[in-house]
């Protein structure tokens, strides 16, 4: 049986520390694989987990938008949606017992609309592989 666990609260209250401890506990109790999603604009769960993040969902969104703005085509004749899916698969960080996706910065002041949509779709597609 799989579960979704969300940790939310005000800044500086220990959400990242709690999440790191929770992930560690779940791994030690063999409740893996785990999909960790850091949806904070100031994401840093990777530092607690000791892994490096190459890119965020926000960064690949920017890359796709710039490709379109310049009038360039996506590699291999891909659509924007296919390009985003391909890039999302490439930014998934594989850790010991968990995988990590990082959302990154918002589109603009207070707006996470497009990034949240991408994140939601990606999580729905791959969540069946995780506990």
Question: Where in the sequence are the language-model features?
Answer:
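Short coil/turn connectors at secondary-structure junctions
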Residues: 1-3, 30-32, 96, 129-131
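Walker A/P-loop phosphate-binding motif and the immediately C-terminal alpha-helix
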Residues: 3-41
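Secondary-structure boundary/capping motif
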Residues: 14-15, 45, 111
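Short, glycine/charged-enriched secondary-structure capping and boundary segments
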Residues: 21-22, 49-53, 115-116
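Signal for well-folded cores of large energy- and translation-related assemblies
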Residues: 27, 50, 123-127
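N-terminal phosphate/diphosphate-binding loop that engages ATP/GTP or pyrophosphate donors
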Residues: 28-96
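Phosphate-binding/switch loop-helix module in NTP-utilizing enzymes
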Residues: 76-131
